[in-house]
């Protein structure tokens, strides 16, 4: 019984802090999604920063992308799929977490959780993809 209570408290804490650790300015929804993924320019159209969007769900908050604040040379956003049904449908989000890398509003790469609800990637792989997209856009 003590184990069950400890487990329940751990899960509740993870759910609460998984959403809280990402400030409100990084959360997007149906109404501002297109604007956000198309808005980040460094110096002009060729220098748009890539956008990393994590599709998140409270039921799987424990498996969220915890290293979001370590991403370099890109902008990060998080979408609560329960509050963004149109985006979820458009990008065929079936599992959370799912991460999509955009450049200039175009989907460049995608990582989806499997049936185990675990994200099959890490910060290094995502950063590598960001670096490749940034390098490719210079030519």
Predicted regions and their residues:
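Boundary at the C-terminal end of the N-terminal hydrophobic targeting segment
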Residues: 18-20
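Non-catalytic, surface beta->alpha helical segment in thiol-disulfide oxidoreductase systems
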Residues: 101-139
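Local sequence-structure signature of Cys/Sec-based thiol-disulfide redox active-site neighborhoods
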Residues: 26-72
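Structural micro-motif
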Residues: 91-103
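ER-lumen resident redox/N-glycosylation machinery signature
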Residues: 62-71, 76-88, 113, 127-130
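Solvent-exposed loop/turn segments at secondary-structure junctions
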Residues: 58-61, 83-86, 94, 106-108
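Structural recognition of the beta-strand scaffold that forms the well-ordered cores
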Residues: 51-54, 78, 98, 110
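Sec-dependent N-terminal signal peptides
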Residues: 4-14
